[in-house]
Swiss-Prot record:
The modification 4-carboxyglutamate is found at E41, E98, E109. Disulfide bonds join C38-C101, C50-C114, C100-C105. This is Con-Ins G1b. It comes from Conus geographus. One of its GO terms (cellular component) is extracellular region.
């Protein structure tokens, strides 16, 4: 192989490096760039962004506290009725998975789901 071939190969490599370094900075992410979070990324983001915030679904829905927080005991029949009734609670379908997994969301939008 001739020296002109090596020179051409080095010139192309250098050109690719310069193009990558100059155009690659356009797609960098900042801290609050919207991104998709699915699966374990939702849990990790929740632990990072919602540190020490309580998430109580009963308070958000305006319903009573869970059975384990009440003072008295319920009969088995009443406990079963409450448990089965909680299964049919209406859902609005706009949870964190629908919002941040199916389309990208920023950290500020994700924090709205913190307790």
């Amino acid at each position: 192989m001739t020296t002109s071939f090596y020179f051409l190969l080095m010139a192309l490599g250098l050109l690719l490096y310069v193009c990558q370094s100059s155009f690659g900075n356009q797609h960098t992410r900042t801290f609050d760039t919207p991104k998709h979070r699915c699966g374990s990324e939702i849990t990790n983001s929740y632990m990072d962004l919602c540190y020490r915030k309580r998430n109580d679904a009963g308070e958000k829905r305006g319903r009573a506290s869970p059975l384990w927080q009440r003072r008295g005991f319920l009969s088995k029949l009443k406990a079963r009725a409450k448990r089965n009734g909680a299964f049919h609670l209406p859902r609005d379908g706009r949870g964190v998975v629908e919002h941040c997994c199916h389309r990208p969301c920023s950290n500020a939008e994700f924090r709205k789901y913190c307790g």
